Amino acid sequence: MINIPVILVMLGAAALLWGFGIEPKLLKTSVYRIRQPELAGLKIVFASDFHVAPGHERRLRKIVGRIAAQQADMILLGGDFVKGRRFEKSMPIEKIAPILAELHAPLGVYAVLGNHDWRRDGVRIADVLQKHGIEVLENENRRIDRSGGSFWLAGLADCNMRRPDVDKALENAGNPVLVITHSPDIFPQVPERAALTLAGHTHGGQVALPWLGALLVPSVFGKRYEGGLPAENGKRLLVSRGLGTSLLPVRFNCRPEIVVVEFE
């Protein structure tokens, strides 16, 4: 005779083991090929929401190795390098930055800061990253020159803890322009001329159930910008599901990811 309660308990235990002990470590690489003739041949790696906990140095080195293996033209980091909640312990940025400094790309390594970074000490985190060769952008842009033609990269301030200024970030920037931001909630304010906006913050909800999707997405727009590559009003947004966790160290049906963008 089938004992339904026992089976349900076993399934629940297996789900907890998977969500807390296994899936958060199953790093995947998501590749997006985007048609943008002005950027054809450009390869970018985007990684966000590291949330490095104490003792996770080995995991961070694994992530850095996976990013480096892509041999991208440019590396973009979407913020939340640390854990910023009061009840969460975080690896200090002074230990994180030297590992991230092992990342190199012909067109540079750039970053924006996230809400957790600012909860800890955004000024200090930005300063440490800068000293380790990672340029932090906040409401500003850089012209990037390459053999296939120049483009611009604009970085926005976090919309939860700071004041993003899209006009200032794009001031004097030509086309094509890429935009990086921690949270996708600013996306409706990004003009159509942006070739692509890259964001993180949502973690894809961390827990996504079959047929129901993510249970909770930290966005004023709910599941609208949960993850992936949504198109909206002629604009493109790529939302990474992130690398780490927040609130609870759990992921279910939402593996941590490194995002690769190949323009055609």
Identify the meaning behind each predicted range:
Residues M1-A40:
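N-terminal membrane-anchoring alpha-helices
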Residues L26-H56, A169-N175:
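Mobile, glycine- and charge-enriched loop segments
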Residues S30-P37, E140-S147, G228-E232:
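Short acidic-hydrophobic surface loop/beta-edge motif
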Residues G41-H51, S150-D158, L178-T181, R236-R241:
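Active-site-proximal beta-strand elements of phosphoester/diester hydrolases
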Residues G41-L137, R143:
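Membrane-embedded segments
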Residues H51, F81-V82, H116-D117, N141-R142, ...:
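Catalytic metal-binding/acid-base residues of hydrolase active sites
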Residues A126-I134, E138-E140, R146-T181, D185-E192, ...:
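Binuclear metal-dependent hydrolase catalytic cores centered on His/Asp/Glu-rich metal-binding motifs
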Residues P184-E262:
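Conserved beta-sheet core of the metallophosphoesterase superfamily
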